[in-house]
Amino acid sequence: MDQTHKKIHWRLGLCKCKNISLVETRESYRSLHPTNQPYRSAIQCSWADDNFVTPEEEYEPSLPSSESPTDSCHADHESPDSPKYQQPAPGERPECEIYKDLCSDPQTVDWAAPPLKIRDGRHQELFLLYAEITLFSHWASIKLVEWAKPLELIYVIVQTWEPKLTMKAKAANANFYVTFSNRHGFPYHAVIRRTTTRIPNQMSLEFKMLMRSK
């Protein structure tokens, strides 16, 4: 195991994960997928359910529009003039546009919880860990991640279709739209997809740096 994988394992140990494996590294992805498909970092992890203690959540009525960062699609989205541009399927919208809608007015989206403040230390640490791994999957550099730390959560928006869930931070299958800043004050946007299977106490995580505020 190289130093990069060792450090990722150590980071994931903060949330008491077990049986952790990097599903795909950037190099193995390129060898397995020669096409120009966007790289996504995925990590499989299993842990006991008692790690997910119900957090104390405080909801705000809406995002502060005057203080919200200016959002823009990331550079890895090809323009229509590019030869690599792929026409989206009918009814499909780019993730960056979905994120803009969420940031502008999350109340208009029925499956999006309002921005939440997390006071429970274990849940705050978990979302910060998600943000840290997202930075690593985007930069592929431990040094740059260390340069950016400590990270600070700005807000989290949860996308889930689990109807009877009051604490959406505990959703077994959800997309987490996380906005966070580094120690230099630069804000970043990330999408973390958490899915579960029928295997007890096992989940799959996908991390993607969607855009950066200017």
UniProtKB/Swiss-Prot annotation:
Location of the region described as Disordered in the Swiss-Prot/TrEMBL record:
56-92
Pfam families to which the protein is assigned, alphabetical: protein_MS5
Entries under InterPro entries matching the protein: MS5 (IPR006462)
Superkingdom of this protein's organism: Eukaryota
- Family that this chain belongs to: Belongs to the UPF0725 (EMB2204) family.
Which protein, by its recorded name, is this?
UPF0725 protein At1g19565
Protein source organism: Arabidopsis thaliana (Mouse-ear cress)
